[in-house]
């Protein structure tokens, strides 16, 4: 089975249809607690309304940070797959890019049932980077900080609980990772800060000229890695 976790934003999803046709159980989730098959206008209303800039919400309160529910929700998605009679009860890989790349690492770190992960250009790495004079990962907290010293201190105290670097340390399963050296959304230095802490078996694909995107030839490599680890014929 493959659990696909989403990149940033608020939008509908179509599911991993080709992989499902190959016989995999696939589950693609959103993170905002709303159905993922509604009209686009509904998501746009949320994007520019109540969920506008959700990635910056409540960093001054450790237990109210938006991503707390998101991280827990990813594990609950794995629970759902494990509840399915069709699932073999063992072979589950989590996959995502950007925010989803972060969530893939987080989910694999939190849930020992997951057997592997695929993470493209993960976000949420080295969140306090800008405080120390280097580029932090998306969502670029503190890049143009106007917080008072007291609020800044509180926020930088809370971020390690959500920093992907601290989840990457706990990875114990094989992973397929990808980054580009011209990525301004998730700077490669921030991604390396997570990648370098991973001691589990890992494959790294680098496309030096790439920004925050991947070339078409990357997905077949990642897909082949997934199918090999799930013992699925292509």
Where are these regions (language model features)?
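Hydrolase active-site cap/lid region
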Residues: 101, 105-151, 206, 214-217
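The serine-hydrolase catalytic nucleophile loop
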Residues: 8-22
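Short beta-strand/loop motif that positions the catalytic acidic residue
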Residues: 170-171, 177-179, 183
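C-terminal catalytic histidine-bearing segment of alpha/beta-hydrolase fold enzymes
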Residues: 185, 192-234
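Cap/lid segment of the alpha/beta-hydrolase catalytic domain
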Residues: 18-21, 25-72, 129-138
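Active-site nucleophile elbow and catalytic-triad environment of alpha/beta-hydrolase enzymes
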Residues: 151-167
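Gly/Ser-rich "nucleophile elbow"/oxyanion-hole loop immediately N-terminal to the catalytic nucleophile
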Residues: 53-98
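Short beta-strand element of the alpha/beta-hydrolase
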Residues: 1-9
């Amino acid at each position: 089975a493959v659990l696909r976790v989403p990149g940033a934003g608020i939008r509908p999803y179509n599911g991993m249809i080709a992989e499902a046709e190959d016989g995999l159980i696939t589950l693609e989730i959103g993170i905002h607690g709303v159905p993922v098959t509604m009209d686009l206008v509904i998501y746009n209303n949320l994007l520019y309304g109540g969920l506008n800039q959700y990635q910056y919400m409540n960093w001054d309160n450790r237990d109210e940070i938006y991503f707390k529910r998101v991280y827990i929700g990813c594990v609950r998605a794995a629970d759902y797959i494990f509840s399915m009679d069709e699932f073999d009860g063992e072979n589950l890989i989590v996959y995502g890019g950007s925010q989803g790349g972060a969530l893939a690492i987080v989910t694999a770190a939190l849930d020992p049932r997951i057997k592997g992960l695929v993470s493209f250009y993960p976000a949420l790495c080295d969140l306090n980077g800008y405080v120390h004079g280097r580029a932090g990962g998306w969502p670029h907290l503190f890049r143009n900080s106007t917080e008072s010293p007291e609020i800044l201190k509180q926020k930088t105290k809370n971020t390690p609980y959500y920093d992907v670097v601290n989840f990457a340390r706990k990875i114990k399963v094989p992973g397929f990772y990808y980054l580009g050296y011209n990525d301004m959304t998730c700077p490669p230095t921030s991604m390396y800060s997570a990648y370098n802490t991973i001691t589990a078996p890992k494959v790294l694909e680098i496309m030096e000229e790439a920004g925050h995107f991947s070339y078409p030839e990357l997905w077949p490599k990642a897909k082949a890695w997934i199918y090999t680890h799930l013992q699925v014929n292509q």
